[in-house]
């Protein structure tokens, strides 16, 4: 029997206001989008959906005290699914009937814990404050495993339907790396979702990560300490050699030895400043993000290569630019043996696990900070290209924000996106970047907030991913 036999009557005042504003704004939008989410529910059953029908029945979640984040009166439920993934469900006191299934960022290389779920609901409590139910898996497998994470995402949706209530509408939300998970879940289980929201998301497939091999090669050329000359040498595209015990702290120590990123620029030596600037210029990232990208290109890349039996990313034939003498730079990389070929079989396995083809037959709304140095905004163009190629281009609305943030773009940004997506699904009227920006300002005015917090850029024209990460 569902834990909520019926949903409470009424909706939050702000939710009613924002819905009304959305309807008004949508009435003037150009061109209808997908008329409803019903066609997705009627789509032919996929192989993954057929396989999911044989999954074991899931135990009911347990009612628990809510972690920090959800508003007063919200109900929180926890459990561990049949595959071993912890999850958290939150239902507001006055539920709209909409469910957002959240796919979190990362990935994290350790075992899944409730702490990860607590961190995400604290950040994404805006979903519940807007009146919507929230369900999120922590994913059974630590590390870069996308298909299994997509399965866990579908599984927590099924748990909600079986043990909490049947939603009026079900939406899929992918944040950061969770965008890759959500894209995979959307194609594996298309009949489960009526709309998709991507925020700061990885939506360009494996090419998103190519530059993490680039930064390893350029860093090693300049610093020569990862690995050191007296340590076993290995192809840097592996991340780390088998059996390595290197820690994050040890890597940071080496990076600071060469670049002194732990010091203000004024306290670095001229050589350290020059090396840091050169890496930033070639890789096209800010200096303060170099260490995080090297972490990924070391520890996460090692996880990826271990899972797929070889290096799925290489840099053979890549011509690097941004240095004072690009010809000399590329020749030096060639002579130093800092070119690495991707293993075709490992590449194929990696692509099969993580990639998407834009086959989303439901409304899709995205947002991204244009100065995001973790997941580059240019990946948004790849999403557009793929959805157009799949015949779904009319089902996409992309927004961009004046921000360098990645994990959370601000309290003002997400309510208008949620309402635009929900109203699109409900009415079939497609929003635009302009109407979403207008709605943001209206919601801010109604709630006593500052219109300046609505940093949407309706006229922003995103460039191709190849303009930021060299193609290979």
Language-model region placement:
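Histidine-bearing beta->alpha loop at or near hydrolase active sites
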Residues: 396-409
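C-terminal motif of bacterial Sec signal peptides marking the signal peptidase cleavage site
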Residues: 25-28
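Accessory cap/linker subdomain of secreted extracellular hydrolases
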Residues: 43-68, 202-355
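Short beta-strand element of the alpha/beta-hydrolase
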Residues: 97-107
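Short beta-strand/loop motif that positions the catalytic acidic residue
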Residues: 366-368
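Primarily recognizes the serine-hydrolase "nucleophile elbow" in alpha/beta-hydrolase
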Residues: 169-224
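Bacterial signal peptide processing site
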Residues: 30-33
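Gly/Ser-rich "nucleophile elbow"/oxyanion-hole loop immediately N-terminal to the catalytic nucleophile
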Residues: 94-95, 156-176, 192
